[in-house]
């Protein structure tokens, strides 16, 4: 099995090393093509106005000055060049990618690009942050991902579908099983944090507040709250079918 590994945290991210170890447990035919720098939050952006710079780190490890989407395209169309991977693995992201995170996530987008290219694809993220901790329990993903990936691939990933996997913020032995979930919803409050530099000139950061709300039943948010591994199938087709039907009746 040939595996293409990418991420959005960058080629030097600890989560990428974790995913390389996970991939190595599944296959000895693993290629890594990851962004040269952190691309968190770039979603499915594609570099059209800047050239892509490719740096070979080792025989099967490459860095691209571009987005996760660029990396998957470069990996499939240039580096592998006709030797198509059997699966694209994207991650392991430092932090969960659930609910609205999915829209912003470069990790999920890397997997989505694999699906667009007709390749089974799985996004993997490790939640963290409870009790003020600033480091992830990478051991959770390390322990549970290989077997879970094998089960997902054996079950099959349909065309135009991405599997979004999130590991809970707990040690491996505290995981309360696997939950197959729907994408959840949280109450996001998007703010602009205004600051001043040393010369008194203003600059700004996008900031998010997440007020507490009860997670929806059967969602990825609920699964993580109960220390379960969340497995969410996502489709590339984002058509709102009920509204399509209603509009067809009302507007035509």
UniProtKB/Swiss-Prot annotation:
Family to which the UniProt record says this protein belongs: Belongs to the SurE nucleotidase family.
Going by the record, the broad EC class of this enzyme is hydrolase
Q: Any idea where this protein resides?
A: Cytoplasm
For activity, the cofactor(s) needed are: a divalent metal cation
Q: How is the cofactor bound?
A: Binds 1 divalent metal cation per subunit.
Q: What are the UniProt keywords, alphabetically?
A: Cytoplasm, Hydrolase, Metal-binding, Nucleotide-binding
Cellular component GO terms held in the UniProt record: cytoplasm
Q: Which InterPro entries match?
A: SurE, SurE-like_Pase/nucleotidase, SurE-like_sf
Q: Which GO terms describe its molecular function?
A: 3'-nucleotidase activity; 5'-nucleotidase activity; exopolyphosphatase activity; metal ion binding; nucleotide binding
Tell me, in one coarse class, where this protein mainly resides. Answer: cytoplasm
Q: What does this protein do?
A: Nucleotidase that shows phosphatase activity on nucleoside 5'-monophosphates.
Q: What is the lineage of its organism?
A: Bacteria, Pseudomonadati, Pseudomonadota, Alphaproteobacteria, Hyphomicrobiales
Provide the protein name: 5'-nucleotidase SurE
Q: Which organism is it from?
A: Methylocella silvestris (strain DSM 15510 / CIP 108128 / LMG 27833 / NCIMB 13906 / BL2)
In terms of superkingdom, the source organism counts as Bacteria
Matching entries from PANTHER family are given as: 5'-NUCLEOTIDASE SURE (PTHR30457), 5'_3'-NUCLEOTIDASE SURE (PTHR30457:SF12)
| Catalysed reactions, semicolon-separated | a ribonucleoside 5'-phosphate + H2O = a ribonucleoside + phosphate
């Amino acid at each position: 099995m040939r595996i293409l590994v990418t991420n959005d945290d960058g080629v030097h991210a600890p989560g990428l090393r974790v995913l390389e170890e996970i991939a190595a447990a599944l296959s000895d035919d693993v290629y890594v093509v990851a962004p040269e720098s952190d691309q968190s939050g770039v979603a499915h952006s594609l570099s059209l106005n800047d050239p892509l710079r490719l740096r070979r780190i080792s025989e099967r490890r490459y860095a691209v000055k571009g987005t996760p989407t660029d990396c998957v395209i470069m990996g499939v169309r240039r580096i592998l060049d006709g030797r198509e991977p059997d699966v694209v693995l994207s991650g392991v992201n430092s932090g969960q990618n659930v609910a609205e995170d999915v829209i912003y996530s470069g990790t999920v987008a890397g997997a989505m690009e694999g699906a667009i290219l007709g390749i089974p694809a799985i996004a993997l993220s490790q939640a963290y942050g409870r009790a003020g901790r600033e480091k992830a329990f990478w051991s959770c993903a390390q322990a549970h991902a290989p077997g879970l990936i094998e089960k997902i691939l054996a079950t099959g990933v349909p065309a135009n579908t991405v599997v979004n996997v999130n590991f809970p913020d707990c040690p491996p032995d505290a995981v309360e099983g696997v939950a197959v979930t729907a994408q959840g919803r949280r109450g996001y409050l998007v703010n602009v944090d205004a600051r001043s530099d040393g010369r008194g000139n203003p600059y700004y950061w996008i900031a998010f507040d997440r007020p507490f709300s009860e997670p929806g039943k059967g969602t990825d948010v609920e699964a993580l709250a109960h220390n379960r591994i969340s497995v969410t199938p996502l489709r590339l087709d984002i058509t709102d079918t009920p509204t399509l039907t209603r509009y067809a009746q009302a507007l035509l």
